């Protein structure tokens, strides 16, 4: 099992935090376990509350059912169903940018 560095950037609050996330754990779950408060609702990849945008790195979010191909190509990610597959930087709190 690999562990990756996941950097979570909240532009609105001007914060940036880096956490260690195993490749078999969702980013949202790991962030919560390490004391970070990220937005979420369904926890199933079926809404957009937890949406973020990839700045760098790669994730596996094959469990999600909400984002369309264009949104995925634009770098949007649902943190509740995203496993890191490399070191990753994500801008959090991006739900409004989807619409």
UniProtKB/Swiss-Prot annotation:
GO biological process, one term: electron transport chain
Cystine crosslinks: none
GO molecular function: 2 iron, 2 sulfur cluster binding; electron transfer activity; metal ion binding
InterPro entries: 2Fe-2S_ferredoxin-like_sf (IPR036010), 2Fe-2S_ferredoxin-type (IPR001041), 2Fe2S_fd_BS (IPR006058), Beta-grasp_dom_sf (IPR012675), Fd_pln (IPR010241)
Cofactor: record remark: Binds 1 [2Fe-2S] cluster.
Residues at which [2Fe-2S] cluster binds: 42, 47, 50, 80
Domain of life: Bacteria
One Pfam family it belongs to: Fer2
Needed co-factor(s): [2Fe-2S] cluster
Family: Belongs to the 2Fe2S plant-type ferredoxin family.
Task performed by this protein: Ferredoxins are iron-sulfur proteins that transfer electrons in a wide variety of metabolic reactions.
The name this protein goes by in its record: Ferredoxin-1
Biological classification of the source: Bacteria, Bacillati, Cyanobacteriota, Cyanophyceae, Nostocales
GN (gene name): petF1
